[in-house]
């Protein structure tokens, strides 16, 4: 008996069988055969078993010549198509992958341990990639088409997704997925990874306990959110915390936490709730501290106002490459809020709101380090005075191209040490000795 698959393969030449058309056909048949009212009641394991049974029956009815390994791979691929993100699902499940970057249907990169790698995973074609994109965005009530060719979304596990399609994406649709880590890292993890020293780790704990306002600066993928999560864990459990994010990533351990997230506009362009609105509402919620995932626009002004009006110990992050650039960036974002202040007055406002700037950097070996800890100590003329307390200096690379370097104290004794003393927070004065060098 001849089947529709005899044209693409045979028992004698199973290795030449093109499984692409077979997967597509089976996928359509599986969707047509599934009773949606029943599968809605099944958990993941039950649904996987039902899909396996259904695909096996369809394969037998088509008399498709497949080896056991090919059959298992095909069943797994169909399960990924129905239950997950198709070819991307194994990458989503891979705990070593931090970012998934689809440049086009046949070019997919991942980031592992700070390094980019080209994978051999591909979509069948542009249409296949678009189906997965539409599956992602429809799950969060969004749409993507020529009239709305860019979308930010979130997977069920919290991973952030950005998708962009033609005509804006010239080489075909593109997806960027920043995976959501389920591991709640602690400060000891950063010490073990040589991102900072035990002495600096204890100093950071004291900075949070002393209710200093902290701005974490860094480029994309430098570990800003990771350090924000860790520093937030030092907030005492008897304080009320309100978090504000564009896309929920923070994983605070405390019980008394209210989590707020922005809302994009709906398909009609209505219903948007911005970070600015959430900050303003947050101030009516009696927070002891505000933790904002990142300041990107005019909400920077509202965050500074909160820091200046009794919400000491608040924390946020910002995109900038150096501590000084970070302050310039803050000025730019405040201007986006429409505040018309003289330069000196604006800088005085910034200097009175922010106490400490942490600079995060991703180095050439992919490692992420805190490369500077600085204190804002006021104004000198029209310039914000920024004193560097610690800095990381790269000294070289080993045979594996791993970065080696030292953390060094500048010799400046920070003003916040007096606050530590008043609050009974212990600090070893020797750590500010410029003669002491901490190798990592």
Regions found by a protein language model. Name each.
Residues 1-117:
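N-terminal anchoring/assembly modules that precede and organize ATP-driven motor systems
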Residues 20, 24, 28, 32, ...:
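Solvent-exposed alpha-helical segments within well-ordered globular domains of core cellular machineries
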Residues 38-41, 61-68, 83-94, 136-153, ...:
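Active-site phosphate-binding and catalytic loops of NTP-dependent enzymes
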Residues 94, 102, 107-210:
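P-loop NTP-binding catalytic core
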Residues 162-164, 356-366, 379:
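AAA+ ATPase "lid" subdomain C-terminal helix
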Residues 201, 205-217, 226, 230-353, ...:
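Switch/coupling sub-region of P-loop NTPases
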Residues 223:
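Conserved glycine(s) of the Walker
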Residues 366-440:
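NTP-binding/hydrolysis catalytic cores, primarily Walker-type P-loop NTPases
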